[in-house]
């Protein structure tokens, strides 16, 4: 008996050993060998698909090829198909009705267009057990829990992650582990010690969504799972699925091959994006609840984990599908119409940064998927393209595409083509603007205020400032309606009331500047006065109206696009002078802003071949005439020169635009605004003198023989006198590109004006007669010639051309009284490149020595509108740069050129450096739209870019408009700074460039003040 028991135990042990060996050794080996051979496929099947590249297994290749070939159908006797394909084509041409059995079966079509994944409706979890995914026994799991360093495997219970409201959009984190506290690696430890911490390796994730829509509804939802650590959809995409939002909860399992490093929170790495397009749920209710279950392993690394063949197959299948769904290297699997459960035509899903849109072409031969299209932050789950014409596909008319049958519940052909979003019921917002018209002025009030004019004001003092970006916050009657409108027509009216005694006098101005930060402009009138402004004396005109165009490039404006708190357009009320005979008490000024929907001011848009005359205006300065004396002042009107007052130089839009040309032919209007008391009077004459400045005036009859205008200021009339000089009075074209700013240089002007008194100023009041002088262009100005202008530096002072300039090239002599060139054409601009920035090598600034062949890399960075650059990269203020800095809006093409000059002291065989030039859309961290490499010692690179903005194509240059990008950035990487001598950046405007409006003007100070007016007695 004991011997029998012993034999029985021996046989049991042998059975257990053989069982274990068969389960873990023999069976996996046979299964792998069987799957890696073709013996289980028929010979006919292999012959049909001979020559096809294998992808792990033949079955997977058939499911994941780029082009799905439909099998040719064999019509066996007695089958439902009674005609061959050629007979069907002939019958279709003869308009013979076909039954469903005589078309390509729908189930075969759907099989070939197999969707990425459709969730299964079930009340039970579909998540596999740990044993199905990892090769681990119960004994081994028990031992691993006792031993430190062994991998541990966890299957979590259901964890609620979030809800989707009736609005139909949701984006929420997907927790991988139940709790993360135990996974934290101590950051105080060394990197070598922290590397021994456990990683998280996720094997499977089950997403469960429980929809609460009515059972008889067809509300659907779709979701995508992605790794938020990646920036591109090709890398981050982990899977997508679709399901109903009603009835039984839906389950879907993904095998994401997801690993998380020690120290990183695994619950922050995955994100689920879900959307319900056809939801008719109220957004105050919950449409669906989402929960998750996971199977993951904790281990030092993946090499200590043994995955089952089932997990390997599932991971590979998910990987192939994800690549086909989301990679820009491959094509995209289209999600089919699953009728009637889920209708997913053109389903749009929010995704991470870069996502794709896929389209497929259905034909009798198969389904062909094109390259995916990147489309913002949306994924079109099912987009089937419209069949192209036979001409575009190169198919003759005889090769007619077979009818694929109907994929919906209706009869007939049903081709669907995808869009980013396609809705059946669209509610359109009302855009009727009837409340804006025929409304009383008091109902059109936007803003009102009261300010005091102090006794100690000086020239340039700002009395009051109204930022337009704050209009939406004021409690005006129509402000809520204006907040609702996309485009508000017309302009804005500013009305000012200021009552001053006629014995007093002061000059005021209301000015509107786009992109102006008033607090940083100081008291310089050249910067404060924009293209749109008006001047007056409240002692003469107690009420003044000023209409301005908020968007100078279009005929509308919007409450919500009026800049930010940093850069915004501003309406400012400015003093043109100090008080002249001030009042005894304080003086107040009240003003109000109204919107004018029926008054549309002309657009302020200039191009290279035309410019509105009202955009070219220039402040000349203030003149004072004492009582009992007679004086005369000579001054030049050169719109190409910047505005100068003392040491302050202002580069406004007029000087920047006119600096692009050599000469101008136009009428000139001189505006004189009386700023002293109207009870002071005098008679004045303004005459034009051709040639250089007069040295003295001995006889008034000499000036009376010249073209002149005699005027005085009327009592009770207007504050400003305007004097026009037609262009035919000027013997030569008006010079625009003069170098000298000082009026004392007598030989550098082609013509000038002389303002002199015919009588002396007399009044019972004390003080001087003071008025402000400005000039503007009238009529249709014509530009002649193209000029690259002169550089404007801090050394440009009273003596004209200074010896301290460091430009690299010799400055040409200014043209004297020569006649101008032929009329300017756009071809001239194509041949002229303007300097933008330059860098010159200096051995003291950089480490190493050129003689020792030291290597030092240098990056030169700048904004291509000439506003910012690295320290040694000097901005050159050419006319092109000044136009970019001073215009408020810009659109069109700009051509750029980078010229690199190598050091001539080094031999060619000693050079190893290269120059890499990149241009970026926004910041240097964004993708570059141009990348060029210069391998020669010296050379140049060229590229072009079209400037486009959100306001009818105009990009805002001086103020923040939501949705508008910053200007382009340039980065020049010098491989070895010691091998180069200089780098220059140049630019040229294209034919389609247009400028609009003026932002805050450029400004710099001189070392010594200059005089614009040359004074002499007579």
Curated annotation (Swiss-Prot):
The record marks 419-420, 821-822 as: Cleavage. It comes from the Viruses. Keywords: Capsid protein, Host cell junction, Host endoplasmic reticulum, T=3 icosahedral capsid protein, Transport, Viral movement protein, Virion. GO terms for cellular component: host cell endoplasmic reticulum; host cell plasmodesma; T=3 icosahedral viral capsid. GO terms for molecular function: structural molecule activity. InterPro entries: Como_LCP (IPR003181), RNA2_polyprotein (IPR003182), Viral_coat (IPR029053). Gene3D superfamilies: 2.60.120.20. The keyword Ribosomal protein does not apply. GO terms for biological process: transport of virus in host, cell to cell. This is RNA2 polyprotein. It comes from Broad bean wilt virus 1 (strain Spinach/United States/ATCC PV-132/1963).
């Amino acid at each position: 008996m004991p011997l029998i028991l012993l034999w029985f135990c021996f046989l049991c042990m042998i059975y257990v050993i053989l069982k274990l060996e068969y389960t873990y050794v023999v069976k996996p080996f046979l299964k792998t060998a069987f799957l890696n051979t073709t013996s289980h496929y028929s010979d006919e099947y292999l012959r049909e698909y001979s020559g096809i590249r294998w992808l792990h297994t033949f079955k997977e290749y058939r499911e994941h090829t780029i082009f799905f070939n439909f099998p040719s159908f064999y019509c066996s006797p007695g089958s439902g198909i009674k005609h061959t394909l050629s007979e069907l084509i002939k019958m279709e041409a003869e308009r013979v009705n076909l039954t469903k059995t005589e078309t390509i079966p729908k189930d075969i079509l759907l099989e070939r267009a197999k969707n990425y994944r459709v969730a299964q409706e079930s009340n039970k979890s579909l998540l596999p057990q740990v044993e199905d995914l990892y090769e681990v026994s119960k004994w081994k799991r028990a031992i691993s829990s006792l031993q430190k360093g062994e991998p541990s495997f966890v299957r979590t219970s259901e964890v609620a992650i979030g809800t989707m409201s009736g609005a139909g959009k949701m984006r929420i984190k997907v927790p991988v582990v139940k709790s993360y506290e135990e996974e934290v690696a101590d950051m105080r430890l060394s990197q070598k010690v922290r590397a021994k911490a456990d990683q998280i390796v996720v094997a499977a994730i089950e997403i469960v969504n429980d929809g609460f829509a009515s059972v008889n509804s067809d509300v659907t939802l779709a979701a995508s799972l992605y790794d938020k650590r990646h920036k591109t959809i090709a890398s981050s995409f982990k899977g997508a699925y679709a399901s109903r939002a009603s009835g039984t909860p839906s389950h879907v399992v993904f095998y994401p091959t997801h690993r998380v490093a020690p120290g990183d929170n695994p619950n922050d790495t995955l994100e689920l994006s879900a959307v319900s397009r056809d939801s008719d749920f109220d957004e105050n209710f919950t449409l669906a609840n989402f929960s998750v279950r996971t199977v993951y392993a904790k281990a030092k690394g993946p090499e200590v984990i043994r995955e089952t063949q089932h997990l390997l197959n599932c991971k590979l299948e998910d990987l192939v599908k994800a690549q086909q769904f989301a990679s820009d290297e491959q094509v995209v699997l289209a999600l089919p119409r699953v009728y009637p459960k889920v209708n997913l035509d053109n389903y749009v899903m929010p995704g991470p940064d870069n996502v794709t849109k896929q389209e497929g072409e259905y034909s009798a031969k198969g389904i062909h998927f094109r390259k995916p299209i990147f489309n913002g932050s949306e994924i079109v789950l099912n987009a089937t393209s419209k069949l192209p014409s036979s001409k575009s596909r190169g198919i003759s008319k005889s090769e007619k595409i077979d009818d694929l049958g109907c994929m919906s519940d209706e009869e007939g052909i049903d081709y669907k083509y995808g869009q980013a979003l396609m809705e059946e019921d669209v509610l359109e917002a009302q855009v009727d603007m009837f409340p804006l018209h025929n409304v009383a002025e008091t109902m059109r009030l936007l803003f009102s205020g009261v300010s005091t004019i102090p006794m100690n004001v000086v020239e340039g003092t700002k009395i009051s400032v109204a930022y337009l970006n704050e209009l939406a916050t004021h409690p005006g009657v129509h402000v809520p309606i204006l907040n609702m409108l996309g485009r508000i027509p017309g302009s804005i009216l500013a009305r000012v009331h200021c009552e001053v005694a006629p014995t007093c006098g002061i000059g005021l101005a209301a000015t509107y500047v786009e992109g102006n930060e008033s607090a940083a402009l100081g008291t310089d009138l050249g910067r404060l006065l924009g293209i749109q402004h008006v001047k007056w004396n409240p002692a003469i005109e107690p009420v003044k109206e000023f209409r301005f165009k908020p968007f100078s490039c279009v005929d509308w404006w919007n409450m919500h696009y009026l800049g930010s708190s940093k850069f915004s357009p501003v309406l400012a009320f400015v003093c043109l002078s100090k008080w002249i005979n001030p009042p005894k008490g304080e003086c107040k000024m009240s003003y109000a802003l109204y919107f004018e929907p029926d008054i549309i001011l002309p657009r302020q848009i200039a191009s290279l071949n035309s410019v509105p005359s009202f955009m070219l205006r220039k402040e000349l300065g203030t003149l004072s005439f004492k009582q009992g004396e007679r004086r005369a002042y000579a001054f030049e009107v050169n719109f190409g020169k910047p505005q100068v007052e003392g040491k302050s130089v202002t580069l406004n839009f007029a000087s920047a635009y006119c600096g692009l040309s050599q000469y101008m032919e136009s009428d000139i209007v001189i505006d004189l605004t009386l700023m002293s008391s109207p009870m002071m009077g005098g008679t004045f004459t303004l005459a034009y003198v051709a040639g250089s400045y007069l040295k003295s005036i001995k006889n008034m009859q000499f000036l009376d023989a010249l073209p002149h205008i005699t005027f005085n200021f009327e009592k009770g009339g207007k504050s400003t006198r305007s004097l026009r000089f037609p262009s035919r009075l000027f013997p030569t074209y008006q010079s625009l590109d003069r170098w000298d700013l000082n009026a004392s240089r007598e030989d550098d002007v082609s013509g000038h004006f002389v303002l002199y008194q015919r009588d002396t100023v007399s009044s019972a009041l004390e003080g001087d007669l003071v008025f402000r002088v400005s000039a503007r262009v009238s009529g249709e100005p014509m530009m002649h010639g193209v000029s690259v202008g002169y550089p404007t530096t801090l050394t440009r002072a009273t003596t004209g051309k200074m010896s301290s300039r460091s430009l690299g090239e010799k400055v040409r002599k200014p043209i004297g009284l020569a006649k101008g060139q032929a009329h300017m054409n756009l071809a001239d601009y194509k041949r002229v490149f303007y300097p933008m920035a330059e860098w010159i090598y200096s051995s003291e600034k950089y480490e190493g020595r050129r003689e020792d062949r030291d290597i030092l890399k240098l990056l030169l960075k700048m904004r291509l509108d000439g506003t910012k650059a690295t320290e040694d990269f000097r901005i050159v203020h050419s006319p092109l740069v000044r136009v970019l800095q001073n215009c408020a809006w810009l659109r069109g093409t700009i051509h750029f050129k980078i010229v690199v000059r190598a050091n001539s002291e080094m031999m060619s065989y000693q050079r190893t450096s290269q120059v890499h030039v990149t241009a970026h859309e926004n910041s240097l961290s964004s993708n570059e739209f141009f990348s060029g490499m210069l391998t020669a010692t010296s050379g140049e690179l060229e590229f072009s870019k079209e400037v486009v903005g959100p306001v009818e194509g105009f990009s805002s240059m001086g103020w923040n408009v939501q949705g508008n990008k910053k200007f382009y950035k340039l980065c020049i990487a010098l491989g070895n700074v010691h091998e180069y001598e200089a780098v220059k950046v140049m630019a040229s405007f294209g034919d389609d460039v247009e400028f609009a409006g003026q932002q805050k003007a450029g400004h710099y100070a001189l070392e010594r003040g200059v005089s614009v007016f040359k004074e002499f007695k007579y």
